[in-house]
Each structure stands twice: as C-alpha cells, then as structure tokens.
Amino acid sequence: MPLLIVAIGIVALLLLIMGLKLNTFVSLIIVSFGVALALGMPLDDIVKTIEEGLGGTLGHIALIFGLGAMLGRLIADSGGAQRIAMTLVNKFGEENIQWAVVIASFIIGVALFFEVALVLLIPIVFAISKELEISISYLGIPMTAALSVTHGFLPPHPGPTAIAGELGANIGEVLLYGIIVAIPTVLLAGPLFTKLAKKIVPQSFEKMGSIASLGEQKTFKLEETPGFGISVFTAMLPVIIMSISTVITLIQETMGLADNSLLAAVRLIGNASTSMVISLLVAIYTMGIARKIPIKQVMDSCSTAITQIGMMLLIIGGGGAFKQVLINGGVGDYVAELFKGTAMSPILLAWVIAAILRISLGSATVAALSTTGLVLPMLGQSDVNLALVVLATGAGSVIASHVNDAGFWMFKEYFGLSMKETFATWTLLETIIAVAGLGFTLLLSLFV
C-alpha cells in the first residue's frame, strides 16, 4: 500500500508539472502534503516533517551551492572559461578538436552548474564548428556528456552534494571516487558514443543548430582574459583542496594514526563549505582584483549568480521535503523490509529507484533526493561505502532524459534536431552515462 501511495503521488506530481504547468517547487510541496495525508501521518506532524526535510536539505547544501554558483560566475564573467576552452582548442588542433572540447567541458563542468556551463560553452562550440566547418553535433555530444557526468557525479553540484549530506557520506570521498568513475564514463558517452550516434542518426550531424535564444553573447579577446594556468587553477581549486584532505584522511585511517590538531585542521580546510569559501576568495582575487576589475563589478557577478539559483534552491528544498515525508511516513522502512534478506546490493537498489523516479519525474535532483528517503533505512543493515551509494544514485538519476526534462528540450533546440534525433542522441547519451556510471561504481566497490 505505501508504494501505491508513492506511485499515485508521483503521477500527481507529473500531472501538476506537465499537465497544469505548475511550478516544480509548488508541485513538490502540494504532493508532499497529499502523500503525507495518504500515508496516515498525524496531522500535527505533517508541516513539521515538510519543514524538517526542506530545512535539513538546504541547511547542508545552500552554502556550498551558493558559493559554487558565485565561483562559477566569476570564472565565466572574467573570460576564464573562454580562455580554458580556446587554449585547449588551439593546443589540440583540428584533428583532436573533440578531445579538446571534452577536456575543456569537464574542467568547466566541475566549476559551473550544468545549465550555466551549457549556456557558456555552446557559443564557443558553435564558433569552433563554424570556423572548422564540422558538425555541431560532433562537438556538442561530447561537450554535453562531460557536463552531464560532472552534474550527476561530482560535488559541489546540487545532486551529489545533497545526497551525500542526506546519507552522511564523506563528500571528499564522493569527489575522489566520483572523478575515478567520471573519467571513463565521459570517454564512453562522449567521443566513443559520437561515432555510434553518427551511424544511428547520420542526418543529425548535418544540422546547423541555433543559439539565437541565448541572445547577444559576451565574448572576449584572448589577451583580455586571465591566463590559462590561473583559470584552470581557480576552477579546480575546490577539487584540489577536498581531494588532498580526503587522501590525507584515508592515509590516517589506513595507517591507524592518532588524531591531532593538525589532522583536525586538514579536515576543516577540506570540508566542502570551507574549501568553497577559500576558493571563492581566491577567485575574487585571481579573476577580479588581480586584473584591476572594480570590486563592485566582482560583487555584481556574485549577486547575479545567487539570483539565478534561487528557484533551483527551492526545488531542491521541495525535493528534500518530499524525501522526508517518505521517511517519516514509513515508506523507507517498508521498502527496507521488502528487500530484507535479498541479495540485491544497496548500490544497485539505489540506482534502480533513482532511475525509475528520474524517468517519471524528469528532474535528476528531485529523483536523487527522493531515492535517499527510500534507501536510507536499508543502509543501516549494510557495510557498503556510502560514497558509492551516492554515485550510484547520481548515475541512476540521469538516465533516459526525455520530454519531462528541461535538458531534453535545450539539447533539441540548440542543435536543431527532430524529436526522433533527440531521443537517438541525447536520451541515449544520458542512458549510457547512467549504465556506465553504475558499472564503474560496482567495479570500484570491489576495491573500496
């Protein structure tokens, strides 16, 4: 019965978002109330549960998400992202242009959120495509593959950051293992899949695409942008700090070293929130002050970034509220009881649930957060590495993007594809990322 109620709730969510065109956040809150009532939760507890879920989720990720958005905006507005992309293109040359786009997209994708990175990179990729007279899809598929993988697997992106917080996973481990899983996944879903896509829908590689909807794009002369080295360093600084801290902590645990104030300081600096604060301060200097940009202009970029993520934060909070209703309403315990004694790995189970919710709901972040509410009770009975459960959930949450996902329509319109061509490229690309991500995560679980 609880699963039937959840299924009805998901259908209702679909109808509200797609049928009635209601705002996603509002729809999530309405469905959270409805599901809570249907599950028989005490009336006095319903509002408390929704507030607990929304506040608990945002309390963990709002700082990381907000600082990450500001960091990305500074890199974009200073021309640092354009410098990274164009330098790699010039170094790799026309013959290896696809690899240049993949590497640039991966680096920029770590620092910028999916939509921001896509809007930033697409004009650059279009310009390269036009200059070299090659298909926009030939460059666009590996570009979106890299952005989608970083979005689904790597902190400080909202999905993996929020899941790690809900499951109590070490965010540094999520980042470290996420990079290990992400690199081969990008190679499969990017350059290798492009060859397959060219055979499946060759006509899509003849389309010109259009970026008119993006309006006038801010472009920089290369000499006006920050240096390549400092741009890459600034974009990757959160990754560097968290990775070093995680490696030191793993060495401490492996060697059984006694805790001390130095190791405590390393953990503090390596905490996701602290590393983002440090990285933002560095970016304010390297992308602004060091280049004689007025501090007001730098702060305007930061303010713009916060304005742009306001609704996304509310949607994440709404997903957290729905997740908490599933937990407090007993659905998570019911699922745990259902799978009690089964041989199914929590990693695989998390992926399956996230995949089903993703196909149903469209939003990767909402699917991932809702999944945590269902698998969390099971994890107490397992010794599985929580960072791997985060990665599996992230992988499942990007599967089979279709008409209920904004990314589907963005890809279709920018690259000028038909519905059939979009399904054969974008939807298949996202599915390859999900399946490859699961495969590499399961492989990694044999060693950690």
Curated annotation (Swiss-Prot):
The chain crosses the membrane at residues 2-22, 23-43, 52-72, 106-126, 134-154, 174-194, 228-248, 269-289, 302-322, 347-367, 373-393, 428-448. GO terms for cellular component: plasma membrane. InterPro entries: Glcn_transporter. One of its GO terms (biological process) is D-gluconate metabolic process. It is found in: Cell membrane. Pathway: Carbohydrate acid metabolism; D-gluconate degradation. It is a multi-pass membrane protein. It comes from the Bacteria. Its main location: membrane. It holds the Pfam family GntP_permease. Keywords: Cell membrane, Gluconate utilization, Membrane, Sugar transport, Transmembrane, Transmembrane helix, Transport. One of its GO terms (molecular function) is gluconate transmembrane transporter activity. Signal peptide: none annotated. NCBIfam families: gntP. PANTHER family: GNT FAMILY GLUCONATE TRANSPORTER, HIGH-AFFINITY GLUCONATE TRANSPORTER. Belongs to the GntP permease family. This is Gluconate permease. It comes from Bacillus licheniformis.
